[in-house]
Regions:
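Conserved beta-strand termini and adjacent loop/short-helix elements that scaffold enzyme active sites
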Residues: 83, 143-145, 193-195, 215-216
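Hydrophobic/aromatic beta-strand patches that form the interior of the parallel beta-sheet core
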Residues: 101, 141, 165, 189-193
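Arginine/glycine-rich "motif VI" loop of SF2 helicases in the C-terminal RecA-like domain
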Residues: 129-133, 180-188
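Active-site ExK catalytic segment of metal-dependent nucleases
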Residues: 161-171
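Active-site-adjacent loop/helix micro-motif of nuclease/hydrolase catalytic cores
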Residues: 170-179
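Domain-level recognition of nuclease-like catalytic cores that cleave nucleotide substrates
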Residues: 197-223
Length: 223
């Protein structure tokens, strides 16, 4: 166990070194590699949170547009990805703050944030596969309103809400926000996934009401 953990740490360090000392330097015009590395460290601590460009800019002593440009560069190099809030008004949704996640969810230290990032990564891979395979156009968003009700993920199919996913570490009762947003979006399915709940052999995409399901069960039915 200790040997595997040590190997994991060594691999992460090597991968990070390659990203910042070679890929970022060679594939972009960014000169301040040290500051971008600091940004990456801050993003790893803020996974699953709204991106506050101004706050990040103040911490790193650069402009907000520079932070946005650097995050885009890190996204292009598959270090992180952002999710936009869903809105029927597409222009309006693009103005709002996105959420940030890492492609390598093992770099996230906080357990709850790491679990949410784990689900986000698998959902993103699934929608990319479905779209590339010609099943339709799929996108991944999150939901949040002015009353601060929130659901972690919304998958859309051809621009229409398809299913919601709320991620919980423990086996808890279904979040009221999941019921609320399913009613508001008219999504066909809604799931609250439990990371601790053991796998059960059941089909998730049948019942229309919100379901409490093991993460393993839902993820096994995506691709």
């Amino acid at each position: 166990m200790q040997r595997n953990e040590r190997f994991s740490h060594q691999w992460q360090r090597l991968k990070t070194d390659l990203l910042f000392k070679e890929d970022l330097r060679d594939l972009t015009r960014i000169q301040d590699i040290g500051q971008v590395e600091l940004l990456a460290q801050l993003l790893a601590k803020q996974t699953g949170q709204l991106v506050d460009y101004t706050s990040l800019a103040n911490k790193i002593k650069v402009s907000s547009p520079t932070i946005q440009r650097w995050i885009k560069a890190l996204s292009n190099l598959y270090f992180c990805f952002t999710l936009q809030p869903w809105s029927k008004n597409i222009a309006k949704s693009l103005i709002k703050q996105p959420k940030i996640y890492l492609w390598d969810w093992t770099m996230v230290k906080d357990v709850g944030a790491r679990n949410e990032n784990f689900i986000a990564s698998h959902l993103l891979k699934a929608i990319q596969f479905w779209t590339d395979a010609g099943f339709g156009t799929y996108q991944l968003h999150f939901l949040r309103d002015t009353a601060k009700r929130e659901v972690d993920f919304l998958v859309t199919q051809n621009q229409e809400p398809w299913f919601l996913v709320e991620c919980k570490t423990s086996d808890q009762g279904i979040s009221p926000s999941l019921y609320y947003f399913q009613q508001q979006t008219k999504a066909s399915f809604a799931f609250q996934v439990s990371m601790q709940k053991p796998f059960v052999d059941r089909t998730c995409f049948i019942e229309g009401k919100p379901l409490l399901v093991p993460a393993q069960t839902l993820l096994s039915q995506l691709v």
